[in-house]
Amino acid sequence: NPMYNVVSNADLVDFKNLLDHLEEKMPLEDEVVLPQVASEQNEEAGAVLSALPEVPSWPGEAGPAQREGGALGRGPWDSSDRSAPLKSKLRALLDAPRSLRRSSCFGGRMDRIGAQSSLGCNSFRYRR
């Protein structure tokens, strides 16, 4: 898969650290919050957030110490020349019509016809 060649090991380590951090922040599935308590918490959070000043956008959030070092001695996740092609490829994939994402040969209709006759490049997807 050509996608594996684009992502560096350092980026994978950053993704892993981010995932670990998010998993620590997520509540356990065993914890059940009553709807009334949840709505009260939402109201309290809304009141607190409305009292806070406007926060700058994400690229401007990193302070000078984060820009120079970061946790792993690397720069932050900013829009660098290295990540720009990856972002554009991901954006193009998300913006592509569903049939283009699904099919690698002729299109959805031809793939279904090929699957019925065991011909075509994506016949394994539609077997029943």
UniProtKB/Swiss-Prot annotation:
Q: Which InterPro entries match?
A: Natr_peptide, Natr_peptide_CS, Natriuretic_peptide, Natriuretic_peptide_atrial
Disulfide feature: C105-C121
Which SMART domains does the UniProt record give? Answer: NAT_PEP
The record ties this protein, via PROSITE patterns, to: NATRIURETIC_PEPTIDE
Q: What are the record keywords, sorted? A: Cell projection, Disulfide bond, Hormone, Phosphoprotein, Secreted, Vasoactive
Q: Give the positions of the site Cleavage.
A: R98, S99, C105, F106
Please give the biological process terms from Gene Ontology that the record holds. blood vessel diameter maintenance; cGMP biosynthetic process; cGMP-mediated signaling; female pregnancy; negative regulation of systemic arterial blood pressure; neuropeptide signaling pathway; receptor guanylyl cyclase signaling pathway; regulation of blood pressure
UniProt region (Disordered), positions on chain: 36-84
Post-translational modification here is noted as:
The precursor molecule is proteolytically cleaved by CORIN at Arg-98 to produce atrial natriuretic peptide. Undergoes further proteolytic cleavage by unknown proteases to give rise to long-acting natriuretic peptide, vessel dilator and kaliuretic peptide. Additional processing gives rise to the auriculin and atriopeptin peptides. In the kidneys, alternative processing by an unknown protease results in the peptide urodilatin.
Any Pfam family matching the protein: ANP
| PANTHER family linked | ATRIAL NATRIURETIC FACTOR PRECURSOR, NATRIURETIC PEPTIDES A
Indicate the family of this protein: Belongs to the natriuretic peptide family.
| Name of the featured protein | Natriuretic peptides A
Q: Which organism is it from?
A: Cavia porcellus (Guinea pig)
